[in-house]
Amino acid sequence: MLYAKAQSLERGLRERWGRLLHTAMLTLSASSTDDSGNPLPPIEHLEELLSSWEAVRRALSRVLDGREWEYLAILEPHESGYVHIHVGVFVKGPVVAEQFQPVIDAHLRNCDLAKREAHEIVDDDGEEDTVRVRRASHPSRQDGIQNLGAYLAAYMAGEYGKEATEMPEHVQRFYAVMWATGRQWFRPSNGAQ
């Protein structure tokens, strides 16, 4: 059900905004070890990662004030089983990666486990890193992510059709943390529901 909702999100926005639809994907993470290098309990890690969410959401609202936009945030496991967040942002009109620096800064200020070196807008080669911006491509074209909503949902869904016990071990650990905390894997903006 979520996959269908996420897949229809960008399609609906493309119908409303046409060629003005632009997308950005922000990645928010947190260190999975303490200052001594010891692994953190996965639930403690998740709670700290999510501690910045309200500040991130407010910063996103300020950055895009006066514009039409929606978001879809997805929790997804690393190979280690620890969680990171992908925030898909759908905007009417052009955006550039640097516009989202205040959003990344809000995460860094409010999540004690977030490290600046893991949240650079542009990497050492000058390529987009923590924030990737694209003009949404039309489904008939071969370049770009065809549907960012579906792309984000694919992170969450993992391998479709498999039972949870048949998923890779890191995905099973992720499922256990989600179940133990009662957390949803996705957070849509009001207009993206």
Question: What kind of feature is each model-predicted range?
Answer:
Residues 1-83, 92-193:
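Right-hand nucleic-acid polymerase module
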